[in-house]
């Protein structure tokens, strides 16, 4: 990480996924405007509510530039969506004249799957041939130490900042709030491409 941090063409990134719930309340110590302890009320979603109870989100924290890039997911994190997120991050880093991303993440099943390892190998070989793009060097965190991921505290503080004390947020409004907290645009959600028969 020290080598990557000192090279101008290298970027260090901490990647993780997070679920943002419309109903679950974070641990929070706060006071209301009148000085009384803030009381959060557990909400529930109506059975016929078409919106999801929670949104999955990919994030890449880049400490060198103090930015966190987010993409929400329609569905849950899977290898194919992880590959799309990494491709998107690579394009953004290439636009910033970066050549290598040192990617630090946990041992989630979709991070170590054959599908994603194949994609990473193909991605790195393709850019080696063309000379264009951002090489991705993966560093797995120890299995028993996921808290070493520097993006984890950002998720916790973000959940405290987006909580709604007076009602239930819609899924889009929740995503908008999360993006405002992380000072990033709300991009189109990532989806698993539909296979056409």
Kindly give the residue locations of the regions a language model identified.
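Extended, low-complexity cationic-aromatic segments
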Residues: 1-88
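C-terminal anion-handling pockets and recognition modules
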Residues: 9-10, 134-135, 144, 148-197
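Mobile genetic element proteins and their domesticated derivatives, centered on retroelements
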Residues: 14-16, 59, 86, 106, ...
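Acidic/histidine-rich, metal-coordinating catalytic segments
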Residues: 16, 98-112, 141-144, 149
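A short acidic (Asp/Glu
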Residues: 23-26, 113-117, 151
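RNase H-like polynucleotidyl transferase catalytic core
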Residues: 37-48, 123-153, 166-167
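Short, basic/hydrophobic alpha-helical segments
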Residues: 81-102
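Conserved Walker B catalytic segment
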Residues: 116-124
């Amino acid at each position: 990480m020290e080598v990557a941090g000192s090279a101008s063409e290298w970027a260090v990134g901490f990647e993780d996924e997070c679920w943002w719930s419309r109903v679950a309340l974070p641990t929070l110590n706060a006071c209301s405007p009148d000085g009384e302890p803030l009381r959060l009320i557990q909400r529930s979603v109506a059975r016929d509510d078409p919106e999801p109870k929670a949104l999955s989100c990919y994030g890449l924290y880049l400490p060198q530039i103090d930015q966190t890039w987010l993409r929400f997911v329609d569905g849950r994190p899977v290898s194919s969506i992880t590959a799309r997120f990494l491709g998107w991050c690579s394009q953004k880093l290439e636009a910033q004249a970066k050549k290598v991303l040192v990617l630090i993440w946990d041992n989630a099943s979709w991070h170590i799957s054959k599908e994603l390892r194949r994609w990473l190998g193909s991605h790195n070989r393709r850019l080696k041939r063309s000379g264009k793009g951002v090489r991705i060097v993966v560093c797995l965190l120890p299995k028993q130490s996921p808290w070493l991921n520097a993006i984890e505290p950002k998720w916790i503080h973000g959940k405290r900042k987006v909580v709604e004390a007076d009602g239930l947020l819609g899924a889009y409004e929740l995503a908008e709030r999360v993006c405002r907290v992380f000072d990033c645009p709300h991009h189109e959600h990532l989806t698993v491409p539909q296979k056409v028969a």
